[in-house]
Amino acid sequence: MEVAEPSCPTEEEEEEEEEEEQSAEPRPRTRSNPEGAEDRALGAQTSVGSRSEGEGEAASADDGTANPPGAGPKPWQVPPPAPEVQVRTPRVNCPEKVIICLDLSEEMALPKLESFNGSKTNALNVSQKMIEMFVRTKHKIDKSHEFALVVVNDDTAWLSGLTSDPRELCSCLYDLETASCSTFNLEGLFSLIQQKTELPVTENVQTIPPPYVVRTILVYSRPPCQPQFSLTEPMKKMFQCPYFFFDVVYIHNGADEKEEEMSWKDMFAFMGSLDTKGTSYKYEVALAGPALELHNCMAKLLAHPLQRPCQSHASYSLLEEDDEATEVEATV
């Protein structure tokens, strides 16, 4: 009785098996390929501050979240567009045209903030001091920066034109009075900014630095109210421009009244919805808190808009208190 011998693989089959094993084996860790980085899936990587890595043109990514039926936005809110624009621009310290918009509502005169010596002061006095410190510090960093002052009550007024001399802006910063405001004309504010400034245009967003950038800093404090605003086509282009930034410091009462239709959180979220690029900074400070909070917020706005990371990735701690948090945060 003959026993069948097990079939031996041919030379061709052995070569195919060796090729499959080599293709499945990851590349060795070399100096040009540390930790096998080139073999990792690119889609699983997340870049910190990818908005301004210095390469890549403005791109858009679809937002997969859909609103549930019947849960539409409130009438006073501006719904963000479906595609979220992600901007990548060169990280350069080009000149800034900073337009500081100061709210002059009567809430700014309420002595609720706690000053450094423990006494009570109002938000207007603190805002005036922190604006002057901001302008003078930015001027020391780069003397080509220009500044303008706009006051906001029921209407908007352009008090100081764009100037590189901090003394010109500070000369009209302190002779201001608050007033009772019934509405907030946000549309008029942006229309005034469009009239007074011109946004730069470059041939290639990814490689050519702009001659300057335009940044608006709104220091706002009043009860939540329906702003007068409609997103026109020129305003939409302004917000989508990679060289325009809209920073907000919102001073609120810190309490939500049940009988009110809106809360300060709704108003703060509305301000944030205007930034479709994710490049602006938004801060909220309680009116009854310490004045130091306001100064800290203004100090964080000293960074150049093209050189700072996204706000969610920014960290201002010098000590690594939380190892896990510091791994995903970019220290400024």
From Swiss-Prot:
From the Swiss-Prot or TrEMBL record, give the protein name.
Answer: BRISC and BRCA1-A complex member 1
Q: Main localisation, per the record? A: cytoplasm
Q: Where is the composition biased (Acidic residues)?
A: 10-23
Listed under GO cellular component are: BRCA1-A complex; BRISC complex; cytoplasm; nuclear body; nucleus
**Subunit text:** Component of the ARISC complex, at least composed of UIMC1/RAP80, ABRAXAS1, BRCC3/BRCC36, BABAM2 and BABAM1/NBA1. Component of the BRCA1-A complex, at least composed of BRCA1, BARD1, UIMC1/RAP80, ABRAXAS1, BRCC3/BRCC36, BABAM2 and BABAM1/NBA1. In the BRCA1-A complex, interacts directly with ABRAXAS1 and BABAM2. Component of the BRISC complex, at least composed of ABRAXAS2, BRCC3/BRCC36, BABAM2 and BABAM1/NBA1. Identified in a complex with SHMT2 and the other subunits of the BRISC complex.
Chain's gene name: BABAM1
Question: In this chain, where does the modification N-acetylmethionine occur?
Answer: M1
InterPro entries in the record: BABAM1, vWFA_dom_sf
The UniProt function text for this chain reads: Component of the BRCA1-A complex, a complex that specifically recognizes 'Lys-63'-linked ubiquitinated histones H2A and H2AX at DNA lesions sites, leading to target the BRCA1-BARD1 heterodimer to sites of DNA damage at double-strand breaks (DSBs). The BRCA1-A complex also possesses deubiquitinase activity that specifically removes 'Lys-63'-linked ubiquitin on histones H2A and H2AX. In the BRCA1-A complex, it is required for the complex integrity and its localization at DSBs.
Q: Per the record, which residues fall in region Disordered?
A: 1-88
- Fill in the domain comment: The VWFA-like region is similar to the VWFA domain. Its presence reveals similarities between the structure of the 19S proteasome and the BRCA1-A complexes.
Q: Entry's CDD domains?
A: vWA_BABAM1
Q: Where does the record place Pro residues bias?
A: 70-83
One GO term (biological process)? double-strand break repair
Residue ranges of region VWFA-like? 98-301
Q: Tell me the keywords, alphabetical order.
A: Acetylation, Cell cycle, Cell division, Chromatin regulator, Cytoplasm, DNA damage, DNA repair, Mitosis, Nucleus, Phosphoprotein, Ubl conjugation pathway
Residues modified to Phosphoserine: S32, S52, S60
User: What are the leading ranks of the lineage?
Assistant: Eukaryota, Metazoa, Chordata, Craniata, Vertebrata
In terms of PANTHER family, this protein maps to:
BRISC AND BRCA1-A COMPLEX MEMBER 1
Location comes to:
Cytoplasm; Nucleus
Q: Which family does it belong to?
A: Belongs to the BABAM1 family.
